A protein has these predicted regions:
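Flexible glycine-/small-residue-enriched beta->alpha junction loops
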Residues: 1-34, 152-199
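Short acidic, glycine/serine/threonine-rich loops at helix termini
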Residues: 2-3, 75-80, 115-118, 137-141, ...
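Residue-identity detector for threonine
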Residues: 5-8, 58, 71, 83, ...
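Residue-identity detector for glycine
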Residues: 9, 17-20, 33, 67, ...
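Glycine-rich phosphate/diphosphate-binding loop of Rossmann-like nucleotide-binding domains
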Residues: 15, 23-106, 184-268
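A broadly tuned "polar low-complexity/structure-edge" signature
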Residues: 53, 108, 155, 169-173, ...
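Glycine-rich phosphate-binding loop
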Residues: 91-154, 254-255, 259-296
Length: 296
């Protein structure tokens, strides 16, 4: 669940367990117009996915590569990594060794780089985090169809700094028992969901003013270096990303009013941004990305 804050106030993440008493897990000030997001994952579903992942690797005789970002979000990706690796150790390690297969874990950005620059001969890429998994799936499909072009091109990445929020400023942890997670803004409930013991949760937000400052830097850098801009946003069903789109238009108008000619830009889905950067790059392009997308 994600939305744009309608009022400035204190936003709180609260857990209600079996005793019915609300326990505050996290709080922060949030300003009107700032985006926030709450997500959780089912540990049971991760376990099912892990069995399917390792069984397929054995069936197709492929080394298994798991990719997550447990260094940045240990209470979310780290929990999923632990779950998957427990399944591997308990059920599949001996069989992997028997048939000569290997299991590897690496950070998701390193995995993305390996897929493009140094892929093994036979590999099964495992990404239990759904959003990133879709991006890499679409990238692999595009690489199979188009490959990497030979033409000369210049690619720059403009990654939003970690201080801006998103995953790098997130609160993340596994819940200790079955219960309900709630998001409250100045005491008013904004969202609630059921969770089970061990399920990882993540709460993150960003600052509207930090977003606009970053967008302004992107425009000025692109103009200085004569680059086209390709933003990657999921604005059609993510209010969280839509605030970036609004910020882009606001900053562009401010620059125009200031007699500054903004460079040409496009807004596309993050998966399309990734595919274009690698399989169909322009002569000179800059690719602004949110924190974790920027890493990838």
């Amino acid at each position: 669940h994600n939305e744009i804050t309608k009022d400035t106030g204190i936003i709180r993440l609260v857990f209600v367990g079996s005793d019915g008493e609300p326990v505050e897990l996290h709080r922060r000030k949030i300003n009107k117009g700032d985006p926030w997001l709450i997500a959780s994952n089912s540990n049971e579903e991760v376990e099912k996915w892990a069995h399917s992942f390792f069984q397929r690797a054995i069936r197709e005789e492929r080394d298994a590569y798991l990719g997550l970002k447990d260094t940045v979000i240990p209470g979310y990706d780290g929990v999923m990594r632990e779950t998957v690796e427990n399944i591997y150790q308990s059920h599949y390690k001996a069989e992997f060794e028997k048939v000569g297969l290997k299991y590897h874990y690496e950070l998701i950005d390193a995995q993305a780089a390996r897929i493009v620059a140094n892929p093994p001969q036979r590999a099964l890429w495992g990404v239990p985090e759904n959003t990133t998994g879709r991006k890499l799936y679409k990238l692999v499909r595009a690489l199979k169809e188009f490959g990497i072009p030979d033409r000369r091109h210049s690619v720059s990445i403009s990654r939003m700094s970690a201080g801006g929020g998103d995953q790098y400023g997130s609160f993340n942890m596994p819940v200790e028992e079955d219960g309900i997670i709630k998001v409250l803004l100045d005491g008013k409930e904004k969202h609630a969901r059921d969770v089970k013991k061990g399920d990882p949760i993540i709460f993150m937000a960003n600052q509207r003013e930090a977003i606009k400052d970053w967008v302004s830097q992107v425009f000025r850098d692109a103009a200085k270096n004569d680059k086209e801009i390709y933003f990657g946003l999921k604005r059609e069903y993510m209010e969280y990303d839509d605030v970036f789109s609004t910020g882009i238009n606001e900053v562009r108008q401010i620059l125009v009013d200031d007699n500054f000619q903004p460079p040409s830009f496009m807004i596309m889905r993050p998966s399309s941004q990734l595919k274009k950067m690698i399989t169909d790059p322009p002569r000179s392009g800059i690719y602004p990305s949110l924190n974790l997308d920027g890493d990838i």
